[in-house]
Amino acid sequence: MGLLCSKSNRYNDAKAEENAQTAEIERRIELETKAEKHIRKLLLLGAGESGKSTIFKQIKLLFQTGFDEAELKSYLPVVHANVYQTIKLLHDGSKEFAQNDVDFSKYVISTENKDIGEKLSEIGGRLDYPRLTKELAQEIESIWKDAAIQETYARGNELQVPDCTHYFMENLQRLSDANYVPTKEDVLLARVRTTGVVEIQFSPVGENKKSGEVYRLFDVGGQRNERRKWIHLFEGVSAVIFCVAISEYDQTLFEDENKNRMMETKELFEWVLKQQCFEKTSFMLFLNKFDIFEKKILDVPLNVCEWFKDYQPVSTGKQEIEHAYEFVKKKFEESYFQSTAPDSVDRVFKIYRTTALDQKVVKKTFKLVDETLRRRNLFEAGLL
């Protein structure tokens, strides 16, 4: 009898403990569900090379703890890969121009750099890249300074040459140091195509502060083959942040060299606007890479892009830069209203001029985005 009572007590104790654990799990789930309701979901979209992943990294630097040493070190092979890939692009591009261009002679690599170029092109075509040594850096520097490579670099818009090229080529000695650890600037400029989805949680006024919203920002792949993965993120989004590389009006896609990047961006922007799940979603348009745009517009006319063929320059210098920027901005405004259903006109639409590499600009922009979305929430709650 005593044994039966003992077993019964142990059973009751175990059952009580199990019930307590279940109740605790349910309580935590309820708390997490409530917490989730206060987290605003932001979707970071844009075509490939729009700079959205740089924006994402800036958020980590600005509103979180940044990159620790282990994370910085993890970018070392990425930086070195960018260097090798870029030199291969320029070397192979110069050979192509030397074969096909009327003024072919200026694209012929000098005799002393010919073998170096072939060697570096072979390395750039590998799946695994060697660590950048002082010897390799010296060879890369030699071919980078070759007149033919500089002529080719001047036509970089035709070759998918990345924005980080000049920066990394001017820092080869530092990048090849045996104790090299990437800096935050190196990380911001390092190019890795986003595949799949990455996310980050942050508050523009500090995590967990009562006065500030908490956001979860999702960055998804920008290349065409990545876009089918977006759909499961669409529901419940507070805002779409759509990035446009306004400097790339004269460039073609990485995945389709017959397609102008700006035309692709226009079509993507209009496609996103027409998605039913975004009818009530706020849109924040980041006209990004303004730093590159303001230099390029003085040399490359805006009307080389089919969408901007009606553009007429009015001046030179800073006045022309502003005129060209306002023209592009107006084009996107027109595109927005033409692609927006009449019953969606009450959703918020804002345009911001951005340079993803400029931390002050990004910080100021996200503070403005935060203010806009908080006012929207108050309006929807009937408090404004």
UniProtKB/Swiss-Prot annotation:
A Pfam family hit: G-alpha
Superkingdom assignment: Eukaryota
Keywords attached to this entry: GTP-binding, Hydrolase, Lipoprotein, Magnesium, Metal-binding, Myristate, Nucleotide-binding, Palmitate, Transducer
SMART domains: G_alpha
Domain (G-alpha) ranges: 38-384
Binding site for GTP: E49, S50, G51, K52, S53, T54, D163, L188, T194, G222, N288, K289, D291, A356
Region of interest: G2 motif: 186-194
Keyword Cell cycle: no
Transmembrane regions: none
Region (G4 motif): 284-291
Lipidation (S-palmitoyl cysteine): C5
Molecular function via GO: G protein-coupled receptor binding; G-protein beta/gamma-subunit complex binding; GTP binding; GTPase activity; metal ion binding
Keyword GTP-binding: yes
SUPFAM superfamilies: P-loop containing nucleoside triphosphate hydrolases, Transducin (alpha subunit), insertion domain
Residue positions bearing lipid (N-myristoyl glycine): G2
Signal peptide: none
List of residues binding Mg(2+): S53, T194
UniProt region (G5 motif), positions on chain: 354-359
Cofactor(s), names only, from the UniProt record: Mg(2+)
Family: Belongs to the G-alpha family.
Role summary: Guanine nucleotide-binding proteins (G proteins) are involved as modulators or transducers in various transmembrane signaling systems.
Subunit-structure text: G proteins are composed of 3 units; alpha, beta and gamma. The alpha chain contains the guanine nucleotide binding site.
Domain notes: The helical domain (69-189) is required for self-activation.
Protein name: Guanine nucleotide-binding protein alpha-1 subunit
